[in-house]
Amino acid sequence: MVRKYYFINKFDTKNINKQDKQTAIIFRNYASKKTDQMLILKIKKYCKKKSLKFYLSNNIKLAIKLNLDGAYIPSFNRNLNHLAYSFKKKFNIIGSAHNLKEIKTKENQNVNKIFLSSLFK
């Protein structure tokens, strides 16, 4: 069972190796305009080897296509398009919110878990 989430923006095995098996890795690279699928698959393979769940930020369609454990929807994403997608039962969607309006948005997006935080403001 995942109890902690660790955000990464690059593939660094040193940081991933420090995580225990109750930690899921969330890859979010907002600095790059182009999504590097090969890098994502590399991280996925490494996480699988370490028995860690792996989530992709802000791209549910690609997370489904690459058969990841799930996707993370940041608080600024209000899109509902993913509700039309079909995905495996074990595919999880998680999101973050900073206030009641964003919590309601995440509920409308049918996320499985919501991070409540003001840390990112």
Regions found by a protein language model. Give the residues of each.
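Contiguous, function-dense segments enriched for cysteine-driven chemistry
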Residues: 100, 116-121
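Conserved N-terminal beta1-alpha1 strand-loop-helix module at the mouth
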Residues: 1-80, 85-112
